[in-house]
A protein has these predicted regions:
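Ferredoxin-reductase
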Residues: 1-78, 134, 160-163
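Short, conserved phosphate/pyrophosphate- and ester-handling motifs at nucleotide-, phospho-/glycolipid
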Residues: 28, 108, 201
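Short, compositionally biased
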Residues: 45-55, 94-106, 215
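A short, basic/flexible loop-to-alpha-helix module at the beginning of a structural domain
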Residues: 84-96
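Histidine-anchored nucleotide/phosphate-binding helix
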Residues: 109-120
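Phosphate-handling active-site elements
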Residues: 120-126
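Reductase modules of NAD(P)H-dependent flavoproteins
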Residues: 126, 130-228
Length: 228
């Protein structure tokens, strides 16, 4: 175990799985962290935030003051061992050959970091990431996404902030108000060839799904995962 702070109360945790050469998962999946409490096991799912890389993987999570497992993880020290359950989940890139739009808020960025760092260097179809946070310091992994966009023309990074500083010159407001910006490179007759992936809190996910359906997206084109 190792970790670093990404933003206030948000940490990036790095883990090494002993005894295996490759930790097998599909980008976008989650693992469950196990905390022993009074002889019982408390499980909490967390999306893997890293691409496939040997026997290592990463998590990105915020500290919930009353959260048992997040507090447990935030109290760990480098080198401590953690029990996990194997990767699961279907929030993965369904059609790598199709154009994709990713929409995330907060730590909902975790599965998208895993997908982007894994897929963008290897694939040509355009991918746009619309990432919404409250303030500029909450733009988790910002430097990585900006570097990725600079290196690969097929990737666009659109951060938006609801409480911007006066110096901020990018998009402002919620992601719900910038769906058309994310779809800007798609002609109306190309909508049927675009998949949209959404990850974040329930209210945002539900709002974005409604907006997408009103623009002609079908249920199969909208892949989502809700965080509590």
């Amino acid at each position: 175990l190792n970790w670093k702070e990404l933003a206030p109360e948000v940490h990036h945790f790095e883990f090494e799985v002993p005894g295996v050469e490759h930790f097998s998962f599909t980008p976008g999946q989650f693992i469950s962290v196990v905390e022993p409490v009074d002889g019982k096991e408390i499980l909490r799912p967390y999306s893997i935030a890293s691409p496939r890389s040997g026997n290592r993987f990463s998590l990105c999570l915020n500290h919930v003051p009353d959260g048992l497992v997040s507090t447990y993880l935030f109290d760990l020290k480098p080198g401590d061992e953690v029990k996990i359950h194997e990767p699961l989940g279907y929030f993965t890139l369904r059609h790598p050959a199709r154009r994709a739009v990713f929409i995330a808020t907060g730590t909902g960025i975790a599965p998208f970091r895993s997908m982007l760092l894994d897929h963008v260097p290897r694939t040509k179809p355009p991918i746009t990431l619309l990432f919404g946070v409250r303030c500029e310091e909450g733009l988790l992994y910002r430097a990585e996404f900006e570097k990725l966009a600079a290196e690969y023309p097929s990737f666009r990074f659109l951060p938006t902030i609801t409480r911007p500083n006066p110096s901020w010159t990018g998009l402002t407001g919620r992601v719900q108000s910038h769906i058309d910006d994310a779809l800007a490179l798609c002609a109306p007759d190309e909508i049927s060839n675009v998949d949209v992936y959404v990850c974040g809190l329930k209210e945002m996910v539900d709002d974005v799904r409604k907006e997408l359906k009103s623009r002609g997206f079908t249920r199969k084109q909208i892949i989502y995962e809700k965080y509590n």
